[in-house]
Amino acid sequence: MLKNKLILALFASVVASSSHSQILKLDAVIDSIKSSHPVVKMYDNEIRSMDEAAKGARSWMPPQVGIGQFMTPYDVRLWHREGDIPGMGSVMVSGEQMFPNRKKLDADERYMKAMSSVEKERKNATLNELINDAKQFFYEWIILKKKLVILSENERILEFMIKNAEIRYRNGLEKISAYYKAKAALGDVKNMQLMFEADIREKRIRLNSLMGRNAMIEFDIDTTYLLSDYSALVFDSTLFYTNRSDLKSLNKEINLTLLKQETEKAALKPQFGIRYDNMIGFGGQPMQYTIMGMVRIPMAKWSSKMNKANIESLKWKTYAIQSQKEMMVNEYSGMAYGMRNELDLKKKQIKLYEENIIPALRNNYKTMQLGYEQNTEELFMLYDAWETLNMKQLEYVDLLNQALKLQVTIERIIEKN
C-alpha cells in the first residue's frame, strides 16, 4: 500500500513538474492560434456554408402543374350527352416548365462560387490581427522577465547594503540616512516584483485565450527574440497588394461585384418555356390538348429598369472599393515608413545603452562598491551609483520594449506572419 502511494506521489510530481516546465516558442503560439482559435472555425463554417449554397447555382425554376375544369357551363345538365349532342366542359390537366438561359446559369454559378473567396481573405486578415496581438503579449512577457532579472539583482544589492550598513552603524562607522533609503528602495523593488509577476499572469491568460485553451493553463515562454532589419524594404503598393489580406479581400470583392454585374446583364436575356394542357371532355367529347411555347422578354423597357439600375450601381460600387484600396495603401505606406524611422532610432539608442551607458555605470557601481568595502566611500554614494545604474537598466529595457512594439506594428502592417 505504501509502495503504491509512493508511486502515485512520484507520478503526480512528474506530471506537475512537466506541466509547469512547458516552454512555448512564439512559432508554437502562432500555430496554436491558426488551428484552435474559435474565429478560425467560425470563418471555416461560413466559407463552407457559401460553398454549399453555390452547389445550387444551376437550379431551374420548378415546374408548375395544375388541374381544374375548362370551359364548363354552370348548368350541370349540359355536362351530359343528349342523344347525338355531346356534353359540354372538360377537366384540364396542365403542366408548365421554363428553361433558364444558359448564360444566366453560368453567370450565377461563377458569382456564387466566388462568394467564399472574400471570406477566405477576411479570415486571413483577422488571423493577422490575432497573431500580432499574440506577438505583442509574447514580447511584453519577455520584457517583464528581463525586468524581474534586474529586480532580483537589485534585491541582492540592496540586501547587501542594508546588512553592511547595520553592521557599520552598530560599530559607529555609518550614518543612518542612506540606510533608510536602501530599506525603502528594497520595499519598492518587492512591490514592483509583485506587479510584474501579476502582469506575467495576465499575459499568460491572454495568450491561452488566443490559443483557444483554458485560460489558466500554466506555461512559460522562450525568451529568444530578434530585432528585424527593414531598412532595405520598400513599403509600396506592390508589397501591400501582395501581402495584406484585407486588400486581397477588396480585390475579391471587386471581382465579386463584376460577377454580380454579369448576373444582372444575363437576367436581361430572354427565357423560353413550354406549356402543355390536356383536356378530358364531358359527355362523350373527344380528348383535346394545347401545347404552347413561351418566352419571357425581360429586356423590355418597362421591365428592365431594375436590372439596368443595379448594373450602374455595381459599377460605382467597384469605383468606391478601388478608391478604398488606394486610400488604405497610402495610409499603410505612411505608417510603415514612420514606424521604421522610429525603430531605427530605438536600435541606435539600444546600442548606445548596451555598449556605452550601462557598462560605464556598472563599472562606476563596482568602483563605488569596492571603495565602500574598503571604507573609502560612503553608503549614500554607493546607493546613488546603484540608483543611477538601476534607472538606466530599466530605461534600456523600456527602449527594447518600444522597439519590439514598433516591430510588431510594422509586421502587422505588412502582414508578416
Residue spans for each PLM region:
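A small-residue-enriched
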Residues: 31-100, 239-312, 334, 412
